[in-house]
Amino acid sequence: MPRSQRNDNFIDKTFTVVADILLKVLPTTRREKEAFTYYRDGMSAQAEGEYAEALQNYYEAMRLEVDAYDRSYILYNIGLIHTSNGEHAKALEYYYQALERNPYLPQALNNIAVIYHYRGEQAIESGNSRISNLLFDKAADYWKEAIRLAPTNYIEAQNWLKITNRLEEAI
């Protein structure tokens, strides 16, 4: 039984019902409907922390989905799972792939920045300030782009850019 048919959560059930109605009403192909079902099931599994199941659903959705914009969100969610699992290099690959298909995805830019910032912090702990500055500069570049796309979001990043004197080149 597909995950979407066994949701216990009221919000998930409501989303599933609305999505099913839209899929019936909108002119979409069978393949597009199937891709969306896998994507929806992936989101549901991901929300419950069932990452292996979520990845299986996302990979199946990727196999079926042809629209670049829709694929960008699938790739972004795969990146989120790898980030949650501490697999930052793999997460970056998926965030970059998502941005190739949809350059207007500020949340992917933000997550890339967070990973570079984290790596910068690790470099400081290792006593390598030169590398940390390079990583922080890279994080700043991605945060500036995310802020440009979504100016009211990422307040903590904006504050960090100000505190570290990296805001001047921003916005």
From Swiss-Prot:
Plastid recorded as keyword: yes
Pfam families named in the record: TPR_1 (PF00515)
Transmembrane segments: none
Principal location class: plastid
Matches recorded under InterPro entries: PSI_Ycf3_assembly, TPR-like_helical_dom_sf, TPR_rpt
Record HAMAP family: Ycf3 (MF_00439)
Name of the protein described by the UniProt record: Photosystem I assembly protein Ycf3
Species this chain originates from: Nephroselmis olivacea
UniProt lineage: Eukaryota, Viridiplantae, Chlorophyta, Nephroselmidophyceae, Nephroselmidales
